[in-house]
A protein has these predicted regions:
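Short, low-complexity disordered leader/linker segments with a strong preference
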Residues: 1-45, 70-71, 75, 118-128, ...
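Hinge/cleft segment of the Venus flytrap/periplasmic-binding protein
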Residues: 42, 182-195, 199, 211-212, ...
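Extracytoplasmic "Venus flytrap"
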Residues: 44-64, 68-69, 76-94, 100, ...
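Periplasmic-binding protein-like
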Residues: 48, 99-110, 129-133, 190, ...
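Beta-alpha junction/loop-to-helix N-cap segments that form part of ligand/metal-binding clefts
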Residues: 82-142, 149-156, 274-277
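Hydrophobic alpha-helical segments within soluble ligand-binding/sensing domains
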Residues: 88, 150-185, 202, 244-251, ...
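Hydrophobic alpha-helical
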Residues: 108-126, 207, 231-311
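Flexible loop/hinge segments that line or gate small-molecule binding clefts
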Residues: 119-158, 162, 174-185, 191, ...
Length: 379
């Protein structure tokens, strides 16, 4: 089912001075003086630290988060690390010094737990609660500050599994059409957002593995990476920004050698996110593929179900995406912020959410998972 979500802005926003290297927004709204308890709007100061404003998905989270925090009536400031962990660390340390008493952190580096642990150590020294979101890391960080630290995100493997299953089912149903050169195999390119990021690693792995499992069950050969000399079987954004431009540049280079004229056109695009999927589409359109109303289309899959990607899917330009619900993530974070504001425990009022489990199947009490859903033209 196609899901369309809307947010109603509950308060007006006053834009203040830029903060840190990336800048930010301070927003203060009046709360009902007769109902606030605990950390009210007068003394709760929330620092929200984003790894990169330019990330299209993060932009949706930020818009929704601003609305949620305004609705709560808290003072907050946004900070943009611009994919630089040192910048973010400086922003957080300065915010603590400046009196911010709740940190909401989209950590830049998560290939190891070090950056997140440093945030926790700094916050714990001042008894400041921390809410991490979106970019996952080792659970030991949460355990080190269990009563005052939480994570809101997604199951890193789920999007890869959903994407791979959808790709496999689509190919089985449309195999001869997708097999442009009629060689009985499907060639693909995989665009990876970042090295070491759990979401990127699992999406890169399962987007192909699960598709191959469906193909094998249907008696079809496994997918073949278009460039047999590439042993990694993916192309990564070297900046770690999951950017459309990286995919466009890669795809333009690919099309110079792998094309209709050489009878070896890439037949499938798999991307870790919608931005990279859309970047690949830009390059494809330059050679007449994936144009609305055109007669030459190769399947392109992404993750996030951004509004721009949904439009492309509806128009037949893109094939499918896995929705990562930015509005739901922001609303979940706002529940935790509201707990701090009212003086409740950080994880109070969360019975409606899904908690993560560890490898032993034990519940992780301060790690909330926001579910994914598939978006495709088929519904």
């Amino acid at each position: 089912m196609k899901k369309k979500l809307a947010l109603i802005l509950a308060a007006t926003m006053m834009v203040g001075a830029l903060a840190g290297c990336g800048g930010g927004t301070t927003s203060t709204t009046e709360s009902d003086p007769g109902t606030s308890q605990g950390e009210t709007a007068s003394n709760l100061r929330v620092g929200v630290f984003y790894y990169n404003y330019a990330d299209a998905y993060i932009s949706t989270v930020r818009t929704a988060m601003d609305a949620e925090l305004e609705s709560l009536g808290v003072e907050y400031q946004n900070f943009d690390a611009q994919t630089n962990q040192a910048t973010q660390t400086d922003q957080i340390n300065t915010a603590i010094t400046d009196g911010y008493n709740l940190l909401v952190v989209n950590v830049v580096e998560n290939a190891s737990p070090d950056a997140a642990q440093n945030v926790v150590n700094a916050a714990k020294a001042q008894n400041i609660p921390v809410i991490f979101f979106n970019r996952d890391f080792d659970v030991s960080v949460l355990e080190s500050y269990a009563e005052s630290c939480a994570f809101v995100g997604t199951d890193p493997a789920e999007a890869g599994h959903m994407q791979g299953q959808a790709i496999g089912e689509y190919l089985v149903a449309n195999y001869d059409t997708v097999d442009l050169n009629g060689d009985g195999k499907i060639s693909y390119v995989m665009f990876k957002g970042q090295e070491g990021n759990p979401e990127a690693e699992y999406r890169t792995q399962y987007g192909v593995e699960d598709a191959n499992a469906v193909l094998e069950e249907a008696g079809k050969p496994a997918l073949e990476f278009y460039d047999s000399s590439n042993t990694q079987k993916y192309l990564v954004d070297q900046t770690g920004a999951w950017s459309a431009q990286a995919a466009t540049d890669y795809m333009n280079t690919i099309l110079g050698q792998y094309n209709d004229g050489n009878n070896n056109m890439v037949e499938l695009v798999i991307a870790n996110n919608d931005s990279m999927a859309e970047g690949a589409i830009s390059a494809l359109q330059s050679v007449g593929y994936n144009v609305e109303g055109g007669d030459k289309t190769i399947p392109v899959y992404g993750v996030d179900a951004l509004a721009s990607a949904v439009e492309k899917i509806d128009a037949g330009i893109m094939t499918g995406s896995v929705k990562q619900d930015g509005e739901a993530m922001a609303a979940t974070i706002a529940t935790l912020v509201g707990n701090v504001q009212s003086g409740a425990a950080l994880m109070d009022n969360t019975d409606q959410y899904t908690l993560a489990t560890n490898d032993a199947g034990e519940t992780i009490p301060n790690k909330i998972l926001v579910p994914y859903s598939l978006y495709s033209a088929e519904g």
